[in-house]
């Protein structure tokens, strides 16, 4: 009976726990004991659950006093629950339901037998759960080695306590403690809530707002796969890729990771003079830098290995440059405390130097040397972004080590010049017509010069390749065959014309077209198309077009063609003149006078008019030059009005005879007949009918003038409205409307222009850079026996074993006013100009400056060309 009473008390305690979920774990620990005082088998399970809740809710370290066995049991318990929830979701849900006791709470009115039966069911369920836990513990003991081998596949998740503190606190000390691998809690697997990617704020706020959430609700969510290292690492990596690029205002250099702000630089530069590093040499010669508060900026190109003086003190040397002229560097010496403070400064750092002290250079050297006496006079500003090395490769395949300014060009002076020469050589080869290295034997002459023989081996010198020179020689030597220029030579022949010519030359007859049966059937149909085609074929066969051989096309010269054309034009003019003559003769034959009576047969007093006589062609055809009044006879009236009166009717032959008889009688009486002035304007005789018409028109105009104004008013009003509409905002808006694709069109045009101008700009930059290069460092050899310095040693010096040595030299470029150029290894060329004989050398760039077309004022010589022997002759 005592056992039954104990079981009943246990069941009632469990029912009370369901009603009050907050105190369930503490009450289960008090009532679940056996008679002998030992803890029950299920005590460990509930104790672990209770510990997990307190561990989740509170972030203190009060559990450090637990034994190692209890920690392992807790880790085993939570790991088993995690495996159950991940692998078998249904049994896990059943186990949680068993723990929560989904059955409704029984009332006090139930009998003892019913309570005992429920207790037995509960014990059986708990035994089944304990067996499952034992099986999972056996599996977990075999899995640690596998977990250590593949930590990436199945890494232990941090405990819930660490996860919660990590989200709430962001201190670096605490995160460092979390990363310690020696903590045993990292072996435990916590049930973290599911981290939804689109809404991370809601999950964090939910955890912070409800820290006392039970462990059962947390265990149903999946853990997030994002660790702290990944979160910390991603911003760091993204920050490195998006670093701001700063252009320093005073030095003009682009900085990476700048250390000094612009406002601070403005404060530091107030009252101080900025001197470029490349201008220090000129300033030192003209001004006293000791009396000026000046600042300069430069980049550390090279750091010389620290050296020691005889006294034992070490010093270091920096080679500084402002990336404007990389051939001239300034040496900065660091002694004593300055060396100790700044010797760790890395190469490529941009530094500012305040009031540096000038030093005397070595004997024979013109390099500028500076020094500073305090480390605070050097300001480290950041890293130079434009400092780099040449991207080209040497002849031995190794990368070039020359320093370049990446903002200007990625290649050094030597490789730019080599590439320019290479492009020039390719261009000369393309312009030549003969690409062979040697001159053909048939074009070779007996007295070949040394230059021609050298060209046969193939080389490039002076902007001309051997291939182009050989082609020019071959073109000059080859005999030119005179070919008569014809139209067939001037025009490119088509394929049809070429095939036709070959057929005519070979005598191949033209093939007759064979008709198919379908075509014959179509031709037999009574259609308009078939009839028209038959009619056309009948006309063609009748005229002899079909089947007759076509005349061969003759190729004639241009002069013969012009002669033929001229003959045709003359023939046409002759025919036209003959037609005009025939027409004139026909018209004159119609107006023939009848026979005059015998009584009045007298010779005419006046000769016939010259206009009535047509000029006969005598050998030469009539010219068709334009002529004013062509076809108008002499003495005819020319009236330019539409309402001119009709011409006077011509007198008949009888009336003309009477007129002549009257004139003779008047002359016999002694009356003088005055001739009319041919230049006088003949007045038109006014017809009374015309005068009446004019009067009627004037009256109508006066009557309808008022009506016309009324009719014109609507037209004026309409025009005013149209003008007002043209000036309105609506019409102006329509005029100013543009297509919505203008932006795309402009972008396309800009892209095309950029694509076109980009290679030209690069070429211009290369030429500009080569024009600005006045001197180039090179390797030269000096023969002490022969006393000369040159780029290459003579073969005689090598064979006779003269004393010589290789050393660094400077190649300088000069030009003469006459246009001749020269290269010298000395300060000035040691010879006169080979073209004009003068010694007026001037410094010039590596590339000859291009000169465009000259205007008339530049080429005009009012006194003519001045010769050397006539200069100063007027004095």
From Swiss-Prot:
The modification Phosphothreonine is found at residue 85. Residues 587-603 have a biased composition (Low complexity). Residues 1-156 are annotated as: N-terminal domain. InterPro entries: Mcm10, MCM10_OB, NA-bd_OB-fold, Rep_factor_Mcm10_C, Znf_Mcm10/DnaG, Znf_Mcm10_C. Keywords: Coiled coil, Disease variant, DNA damage, DNA replication, DNA-binding, Isopeptide bond, Metal-binding, Nucleus, Phosphoprotein, Ubl conjugation, Zinc, Zinc-finger. Residues 106-120, 151-167, 568-582 have a biased composition (Basic and acidic residues). Pfam families: Mcm10, MCM10_OB, zf-CCCH_Mcm10, zf-primase. Residues 38-64, 80-90 have a biased composition (Acidic residues). Residues 104-142 form a coiled coil. There is a cross-link at residues 493, 627, 762-763 (Glycyl lysine isopeptide (Lys-Gly) (interchain with G-Cter in SUMO2)). SMART domains: Mcm10 (SM01280). Residues 238-389 are annotated as: OB-fold domain. Residues 206-224 have a biased composition (Polar residues). Its main location: nucleus. GO terms for cellular component: nuclear replication fork; nucleolus; nucleoplasm; nucleus. Residues 783-802 are annotated as: Zinc finger-like 2. The keyword Ribosomal protein does not apply. GO terms for molecular function: DNA replication origin binding; enzyme binding; identical protein binding; single-stranded DNA binding; zinc ion binding. Residues 31-120, 137-167, 179-228, 567-630 are annotated as: Disordered. Belongs to the MCM10 family. Acts as a replication initiation factor that brings together the MCM2-7 helicase and the DNA polymerase alpha/primase complex in order to initiate DNA replication. Additionally, plays a role in preventing DNA damage during replication. Key effector of the RBBP6 and ZBTB38-mediated regulation of DNA-replication and common fragile sites stability; acts as a direct target of transcriptional repression by ZBTB38. Self-associates. Interacts with ORC2. May interact with MCM2 and MCM6. Interacts with the DNA polymerase alpha subunit POLA1. Interacts with RECQL4; this interaction regulates RECQL4 unwinding activity. Interacts with WDHD1. Each zinc finger-like domain binds a zinc ion and is involved in both ssDNA and dsDNA binding, as is the OB-fold domain. The N-terminal domain mediates homodimerization. This is Protein MCM10 homolog. The lineage of its organism: Eukaryota, Metazoa, Chordata, Craniata, Vertebrata.
């Amino acid at each position: 009976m005592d056992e039954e009473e104990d079981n009943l008390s246990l069941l009632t305690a469990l029912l009370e726990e369901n009603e009050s979920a907050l105190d369930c774990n503490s009450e289960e620990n008090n009532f679940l004991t056996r008679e002998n005082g030992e803890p029950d088998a299920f005590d460990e399970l509930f104790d672990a659950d209770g510990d997990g809740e307190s561990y989740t809710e509170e972030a203190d370290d009060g559990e450090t006093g637990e034994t190692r066995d209890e920690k392992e049991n807790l880790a085993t318990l939570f790991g088993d629950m995690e495996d159950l929830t991940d692998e078998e979701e249904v049994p896990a849900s059943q186990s949680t339901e068993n723990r929560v006791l989904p059955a409704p709470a029984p009332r006090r009115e139930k009998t003892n037998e019913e309570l005992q039966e429920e207790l037995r069911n509960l014990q059986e369920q708990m035994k089944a759960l304990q067996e499952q836990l034992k099986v999972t513990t056996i599996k977990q003991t075999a899995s640690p080695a596998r977990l250590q081998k593949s930590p990436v596949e199945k890494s232990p998740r941090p405990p819930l306590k660490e996860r919660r503190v990590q989200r709430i606190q962001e201190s670096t000390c605490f995160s460092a403690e979390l990363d310690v691998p020696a903590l045993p809690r990292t072996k435990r697997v916590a049930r973290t809530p599911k981290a939804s990617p689109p809404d991370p704020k809601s999950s964090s706020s939910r955890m912070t707002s409800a820290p006392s959430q039970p462990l059962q609700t947390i265990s149903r969510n999946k853990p997030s796969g994002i660790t702290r290292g990944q979160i910390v690492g991603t911003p760091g990596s993204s920050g490195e890729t998006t670093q701001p690029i700063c252009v320093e205002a005073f030095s003009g250099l682009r900085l990476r990771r700048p250390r000094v702000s612009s406002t601070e630089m403005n404060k530091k530069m107030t009252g101080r003079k900025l001197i470029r590093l490349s201008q220090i040499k000129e300033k030192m010669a003209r001004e006293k830098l000791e009396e000026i508060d000046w600042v300069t900026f430069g980049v550390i190109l090279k750091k010389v290995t620290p050296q020691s003086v005889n006294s034992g003190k070490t010093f270091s040397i920096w080679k500084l440059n402002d990336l404007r002229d990389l051939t001239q560097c300034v040496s900065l010496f660091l002694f004593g405390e300055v060396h100790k403070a700044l010797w760790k400064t890395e190469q490529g750092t941009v530094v500012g130097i305040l009031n540096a002290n000038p030093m005397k250079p070595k004997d024979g050297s013109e390099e500028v040397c500076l020094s500073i006496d305090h480390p605070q006079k050097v300001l480290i500003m950041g890293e130079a972004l434009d400092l780099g090395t040449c991207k080209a490769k040497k002849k031995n395949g190794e990368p070039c080590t020359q320093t370049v300014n990446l903002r200007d060009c990625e290649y050094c002076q030597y490789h730019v010049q080599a590439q320019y020469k290479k492009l020039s050589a390719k261009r000369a080869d393309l312009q030549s017509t003969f690409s062979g290295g040697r001159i053909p034997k048939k074009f070779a002459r007996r007295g070949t010069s040394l230059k021609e023989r050298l060209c046969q081996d193939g080389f490039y010198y002076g902007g001309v390749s051997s291939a182009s020179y050989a082609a020019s020689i071959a073109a000059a030597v080859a005999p030119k065959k005179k070919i008569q220029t014809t139209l067939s030579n001037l025009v490119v022949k088509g394929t049809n014309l070429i095939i036709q010519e070959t057929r005519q030359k070979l005598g191949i007859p033209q093939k007759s077209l064979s008709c198919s049966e379908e075509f014959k059937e179509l031709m037999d149909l009574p259609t308009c198309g078939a009839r028209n085609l038959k009619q056309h074929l009948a006309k063609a066969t009748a005229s002899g077009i079909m089947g007759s051989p076509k005349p061969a096309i003759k190729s004639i010269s241009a002069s013969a063609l012009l002669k033929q054309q001229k003959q045709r034009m003359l023939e046409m003019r002759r025919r036209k003149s003959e037609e005009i003559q025939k027409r004139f003769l026909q018209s004159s034959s119609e107006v023939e006078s009848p026979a005059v009576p015998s009584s009045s047969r007298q010779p005419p007093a006046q000769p016939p008019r010259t206009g009535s006589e047509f000029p006969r062609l005598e050998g030469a055809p009539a010219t068709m030059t334009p002529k004013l009044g062509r076809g108008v006879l002499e003495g005819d009236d020319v009236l330019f009005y539409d309402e001119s009166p009709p011409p006077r009717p011509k007198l008949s032959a009888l009336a003309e005879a009477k007129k002549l008889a009257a004139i003779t009688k008047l002359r016999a009486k002694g009356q003088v007949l005055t001739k009319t002035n041919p230049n006088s304007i003949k007045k038109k005789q006014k017809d009374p009918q015309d005068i009446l018409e004019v009067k009627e028109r004037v009256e109508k105009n006066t009557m309808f003038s008022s009506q016309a104004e009324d009719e014109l008013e609507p037209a004026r009003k309409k025009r005013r409205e149209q003008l007002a509409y043209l000036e309105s905002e609506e019409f102006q808006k329509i005029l100013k409307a543009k297509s919505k694709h203008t932006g795309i069109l402009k972008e396309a045009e800009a892209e095309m222009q950029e694509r076109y101008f980009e290679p030209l700009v690069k070429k211009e930059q290369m030429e500009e850079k080569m024009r600005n290069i006045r001197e180039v460092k090179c390797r030269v050899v000096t023969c002490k026996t022969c006393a000369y310095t040159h780029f290459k040693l003579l073969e005689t010096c090598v064979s006779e074993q003269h004393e010589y040595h290789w050393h660094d030299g400077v190649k300088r470029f000069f030009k003469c006013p006459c246009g001749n150029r020269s290269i010298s290894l000395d300060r000035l060329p040691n010879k006169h100009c080979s073209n004009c004989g003068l010694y007026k050398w001037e410094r010039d760039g590596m590339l000859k400056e291009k000169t465009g077309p000259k205007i008339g004022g530049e080429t005009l010589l009012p006194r003519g060309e001045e010769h050397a022997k006539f200069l100063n002759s007027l004095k």
